[in-house]
Amino acid sequence: MLLVGLFAASSAQFLHIDTARLNSSYRALLKEPQSSSMQMEFFNAFPANWNDFYCTYRFCEKDGYDLSMYDAAYEHIEALGGCTAINDTLFCKRLIALSVGASLEVDAPNYLHGLVHRRMKQKSDIFMYCLSQIERGHQMQFWQFYLSRIVGGATDKSEFKALHAKYKKKYPDMMKRMAVAYENFHNGVLFISDFYRNL
């Protein structure tokens, strides 16, 4: 979580995304949304990990800061979710990389959070296999983000129980980590910006 503060202090030195390519590939995708080549180009241009994602789509109150990417976050993330031609394993790995190290926050991180949940419901077997291949600490980081809720409800609880019941035999250790994350982060966090303000 401390990384978020560091990035907020000076994102330029960390930004590795070609935003011109990202924006141009998004515009091309809008013209041909079913094109597998346009989908792949946009997918490849999209941030590959949480650090780059945060630096690309973050909000900054500093005078003169260009908020065009912040404003484009929702449309870009929805477009990413619509890239159905991308190999499922590749797509799930990308969502895992975007989630590991992430903190719940308004706008872009919240949109990402929703996309990861939607894809988990559609491709849980692939998600779980990909997660089982990464280090246990990074598994915990994924579940931390995935299960973070400021105020959770019955739907979240039923989703957790369903996933846990479905995979506890195949991935017992990972389901233990998932349960720990649920206990601590579901109804147990604030948006990270609110947390910093409350210190």
Where in the sequence are the language-model features?
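Bacterial Sec-dependent N-terminal signal peptides
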Residues: M1-R21
